[in-house]
Amino acid sequence: QPQNHTSDLYIWLQQNGYKIEQEVLAEEGTQLYEILYVTHGHMDPFSEIEAEIGVTESRYKDKLFVKHLKKLINQRKMILNGIDIESANVVNTAKYQKALTDEAILEEILWRFM
């Protein structure tokens, strides 16, 4: 299982004829791991942020789901804190806007689970 950029794996699986049947989060120390049960099949398209959050109902029922959301929110905050928007170039401005949008989506989902 990849530990970074898991959304890339999700999107690759979807685009190459695989279906994510189940997602489980596992925790070891401070690290969260994503465990996937994958079969051949069709999945409806999903966005990059949906791929990071999880694309199956099992993810939303996982006891570590809130912790997973908080981790994703913290990653966005680190991006936002690392970019000086006043002096940012076009690429950094786009990264900033994406992180801001993603953070808002994640916060809204987290609010529903708190």
Explain the meaning of each model-derived region.
Residues 1-114:
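Class I S-adenosyl-L-methionine
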